[in-house]
Amino acid sequence: MIRFHLLSAGDAIYSLSGLLRGSSALRVGTATLGRTAVEHLSRAMFLGESGINYRQRIQRTATLMEKGINEYRPSMPDHAIANSLVQQWTHFMARNRLEFKGLKAEKVSQYSVLVEKYFPKIGYVELSRPTHGNAIWVTLTVISEQQGGGASRVYALRNLAYCLDCLVTACDTVVQLWSLDIAAVERQANDDGPEPMTWNSVLQLRDSMLEIAESFEPRDYADFVDNPHPYGTSS
């Protein structure tokens, strides 16, 4: 399950980076993909957290499965498949209940709580504003774009930098959890991937992206006028 969440997060971040290659960054698209990536990474951290044993990881996985069925309505065509998967986990936990006896019941916190726990930075808030259609964010961003402020490009860079930082944190956790050999992982990744990369190059990219993102001040890309108007004039 940890691996599944990392793969999903990587897919979202790769798609996010693709939006930056165009002539105009898509401000809502990058935020939505970024938020998806960070939420997946928070679940990977929840399962791979240091200080818990394998029984607790299994219990947390089962809890995630049980919680996940809430998003599959009985009227949905894939509900039966999802429910069958959950039932398999329920039966597994029931058959092995003695092994898990005495463990404190696990609860899965909301995404925002998990993200704040494992990635305590304001980046998630920035991702959530456009995802939820925050009126203030939309107004300031559109005005900035109309005035040539480049808000979408700056927000997209900040989104990617934050996601890369979260990805590195999650990968570090997994490396320690599974005692992985980074060199072996690099070789496997380069065999499977289109472009050769090293872990050090990923860290350097993360650091450079964070440096660029942190170099911008709000006044460089956001328009804080007294009376924001969608057409850039006062009514």
Residue locations for each model-derived region?
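A cross-kingdom marker of C-terminal helix-rich interaction/assembly modules
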Residues: 1-40, 44-235
